[in-house]
Regions:
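A short, polar/acidic, helix/strand-boundary loop motif
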Residues: 144-172, 176, 199-202
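Acidic, metal-ligating active-site segments
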Residues: 131-140
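Catalytic palm subdomain of template-directed nucleic-acid polymerases
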Residues: 1-8, 24-34, 43-46, 160-162, ...
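RNase H catalytic domain
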Residues: 141, 175-233, 237
Length: 244
């Protein structure tokens, strides 16, 4: 109550609940340490039938997009559906659409449980770019050295960005990650370990041969406490092994 008063916020005491262990807020089930999807919404996904037109498909995509923070590689999974809508062709529900639809439903139903961000815990940021789709995951170790997912982020590159040199593409998705999660990453007490599959970026903050636009981008990172580390999907190395 004191904190609310300090922030000059007023509340209706009759509508408040105190000492609860979990609560549904903005269609999320929030507990002391975790964040889940609303089970009622997940049942709606289970019961969702196929679509008769593009409008129905767009509604489903928008619904899933609301929960994309829970879904790893979201943009990659839903890419085929989005392409169908963007082309504005005559709607035809085919085998590919059915496969993507079933895949999306499985990911929604079996989604991860996210943990709340703790600025005192060690933070891991893993970044990957595949087929012009930026996929990122923010994780943290708890007191028992167990790595938990905090949030997922997935985004398609714009057309102009697809023509960038590989170094600039990778640098751009680093900038996007810190921009997207700045309110979390700026508060970390421990240096963030950021993994990316591009060795040339390891010495990014010490590189004296950056172009002008690269220097402008790097300036956006100077307020963050982080260290870039290399990882490769081809080596099939787990983040746990790299950070411990």
């Amino acid at each position: 109550m004191n904190k609310l008063q300090e922030a000059d916020l007023q509340i209706n005491i009759n509508k408040c609940k105190f000492h609860v262990q979990k609560i549904i807020f903005l269609e999320f089930l929030m507990s002391i340490k975790k964040l889940k999807m609303n089970s009622r919404k997940m049942q709606a996904v289970v019961d969702w039938s196929t679509f008769n037109n593009l409008t129905q498909m767009q509604f489903f995509i928008d619904f899933c997009n609301f929960y994309q923070r829970f879904i790893k590689n979201f943009s990659k999974i839903v890419h085929s559906m989005i392409q169908l809508i963007q082309k504005k062709i005559i709607f035809e529900w085919n085998e590919v659409c059915q496969i993507v639809f079933n895949h999306m439903k499985r990911y929604m139903i079996k989604t991860s449980i996210l943990h709340h961000f703790d600025q005192t815990c060690e933070t891991i940021l893993k970044i990957n770019l595949f087929n012009y789709i930026n996929d990122e995951v923010l994780s943290q170790y708890d007191d028992e050295e167990v790595l938990h997912s905090i949030v997922f982020y997935s985004k398609n590159m714009f057309f102009a960005e697809c023509n960038y040199e590989i170094y600039d593409k990778k640098l751009l998705i680093i900038i996007q990650a810190f921009k997207h999660w700045w309110f979390k990453l700026k508060l970390t007490d421990i240096s963030i370990k950021m993994f990316i599959d591009h060795q040339a970026l390891i010495s990014l903050m010490k590189d004296k041969e950056l172009s002008r636009h690269q220097m402008r981008w790097v300036q956006k990172l100077i307020d963050f406490n982080f260290r870039i580390m290399y990882w490769s999907d081809k080596q099939n190395i787990k983040i746990n092994a790299l950070t411990r």
